Amino acid sequence: MKELTLWIPVALSVIGLLFMLYKFLWVKKQDAGNEKMQGISKSIAEGAMAFLSAEYRLLFIFVIVASLALFGISRIVETTSWLIVPAFITGAIFSGLAGNIGMKVATAANVRTTQAARTSLPKALNVSFSGGTVMGLGVAGLAVLGLTLFFILFSSHFIVGERSFSEEMVFALEALAGFSLGAESIALFARVGGGIYTKAADVGADLVGKVEAGIPEDDPRNPATIADNVGDNVGDVAGMGADLFGSYVATVLAAMVLGNYVIRDYVEANGTAFVDNFSGMGPVILPIVIAGVGIIASIIGTFLVRTNKSDASEADVQRVLNLGNWSAIIITAVVTFFLIRWMLPSTIYMDFFGEGILEVASINVFYASLIGLAVGGLISAITEYYTGTGKKPVMNIIKNSSTGAATNIIAGLATGMMSTFLSILLFAAAIWGSYELAGFYGVAIAASAMMATTAMQLAIDAFGPIADNAGGIAEMSDLPEEVRERTDVLDSVGNTTAAVGKGFAIASAALTALALFAAYVTFTGIDGINIFKAKTLAALFVGGMIPVVFSAMVMQSVGKAAMEMVQEVRRQFREIPGILEGTGKPDHGKCVEISTNAALKEMMLPGALTIVTPILIGFFMGAESLGAYMAGVTVSGVLWAIFQNNAGGAWDNAKKSFEAGIEIDGKMTYKGSEAHKAAVTGDTVGDPFKDTSGPSMNILIKLTCLIGLVMAPILGSENSANSDMATIDQSNEIHVETIDEEGNIVYDLGEMIEIELPSGEVINVGNKSSEAKINDFMSSAWVNGNLVNQQSNWITLDRVYFKSGESRMLRNSMDQLKYIATIMDAYPEMKIKIGGFTDKMGDEERNLKISSDRANFVKDFLEREGVQGDRMQAEGYGPQQFVCAANDTEICRAKNRRIDIKVVLS
């Protein structure tokens, strides 16, 4: 069944790619207009492909260097195979291919949309949205196909039965992480490079053309016009395609990694192998199958994006786009319900931090997926509210434009900042809700379900720049005003859908980062992030700072490139006679060259910052500090992404409103007015916000967490080495009392011995360990069949530790409690009293509660291990019965913070 199931997403991805090909050929068959229109379109296509070719040549060198580094890691880390290298290279190639497909269809669809707009708006919508559909299905189809084929290869190679299933699956998924790392690495440079290109051209064209010369947008007299239209493709098409390709892959990968831990937790909780109809890997392959189903749901959704109204308004176009989107979401939700019922057992087990392994009904996983799908829809609604034409926030910016550029910018900044409120509350509720339902696996499935309709989301998003280009071609070709009016309707909706698409990308980055973070914590074996450690807190602050510095670097790059563009456009207006009169021909090629060179040069430093910083943090500060750094980048990055995306989108639509004519204080205000010029300035500031630094935050977040995940085996092996050293220290004849990094006492466990219990079970423990003391008591309690000792003294559990100030037990404590459960199973007459104790630090009442919670946590854990509840009592004593009366040193206080048990016989 596993083999058949794994080929289902392959088949679904192939269907998606075939439908993509059909749509691409349909677009190419449409009328491309007159010779002048085709010439302009050809210039845009040549400029776009020239940039991509130059960018890919640079990235080829990066891929070679990164591949060699990954190969070196595979030689020194046991769980990392050399197969991570071909996976990385293929991920990079597929990411580049996804962007290339989008570029090809966008530069073919733009002029055909213009020609269709000469006939009717519905036909123009059909052509532009079909172009977007090609982009969406190309990204989704390649992502699912690549992931599934590599997983089939790696699972067959690594899962051979020599180790436990989950251990062997770790090898397969670690190699598969290379595919995701390759995709995100290329996406970073495509997003940053494309963003710098497009905004250098856009800002330069607007500042000199609109503000100084007073000529319309996309006027053929503007030397930067072609570069501006090329930029729409390299930034909003190729860049967005690579971005969502990376998100798609990373989300599914994170869910697969956490699915493997669901299998491991099931085995730990039940002591038996995980059995299902999919060779015991249902939780791992479920996310891929959901992704495949999302492709088909998206195809169905595309058929609903139609309108018959020749005079359709922006609201009408937005309505049919929303219909297609929500239809795809609902279809995915319904099919996901049946997939979960089919692929997961009715009950699964998961490790909840602070609570141990708990039983979870598999229907909860479905509820978590509904949360993810709802987030995808709701974030679109929130973004549309803050950036949509006619909505209150945009109208407020329009009103503030009447008093100048300064008040316009203040209003735009406030709109972006305020937009974080609802978005972050939505993310927080989604994370909390999905975690409560089904742990981190629930969070990952929520993200996977949301990303399942990526093909539809990207189709909606990519149609925007196609419509924008179509309007530019109409303007440069001197087509009738009615054609530009139709393309402006699509362009205005496209601005909102672009902002919505960026909001969707932010939501995916937030949920994906959390899922990757959970996988990282499990991979490294750390028990959480303790911010009371100076080193960890320092890394958290550095992580929070990185998105701010990254944004600054990108904004400076745009400013520098835009300055060159402004100077070049001014030079041409000054030196080439007749440009403004329409008799001279501007040198468009020079502006394209400036944008290309600036983008390629300026994208390297932000890229290096993103990749090198987490590597340095991990190697020099350790696993826990890298985890804190990842958390800092994620929280700060999400906030900055929302702020910049929505501020830029709102500024853009405020400017667009003036071009159509808008009423301010009872008076109509149009293009060319002082208020319009203020709005143009605001839009110019917002352009790099929404199209360069804002979207780059998503990849910064995901790539940081992916690098952490790839480094996790190295850092995890260091943690293991440290643990081994601690064990060696404990077995020395002379034991020096120490405390570990968490502040827990390291006890002398003595020499390792085998203890055979009456049940026949054998446990391997130290001869001075708690288990040895309990067994010694039980062995000596009877003499000649008579009970001579009814109760032991308190025995401290020497390897049961809790998070400081919490009732959350550290994961490495579970082994000792499992041994205690085994001993109690061997001695059915044995009962125990569990006591929780603390030191005197802090509030006494709180200490008493913590000690009680810890004692009850141990009791609950032992019950889950099969010990009957009536054989145990639990009580918290707080700061009482010190074993170290002075309570004046760290070691002394660590001894007093403990869990003791007292054996009772009757």
Where are these regions (language model features)?
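Short strand->helix junction
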Residues: V483, S696, S807, K840-M841
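Short, histidine-centered active-site or binding-site loop motifs used for metal coordination
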Residues: T107, R799-Y801, G836-K840
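Periplasmic OmpA-like peptidoglycan-binding domain that tethers envelope proteins to the cell wall
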Residues: V746, R808-N812, Y827, G835-S906
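Hydrophobic packing and interface segments
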Residues: M1-D729
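A generic secondary-structure signal
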Residues: A50, Y819-I823, F861-L862
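Hydrophobic alpha-helical membrane-association signature
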Residues: I40, M565, S813-Q816, R854, ...
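Acidic/polar residues in short coil/turn loops that connect beta-strands
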Residues: E46, D461, D740-E742, S759, ...
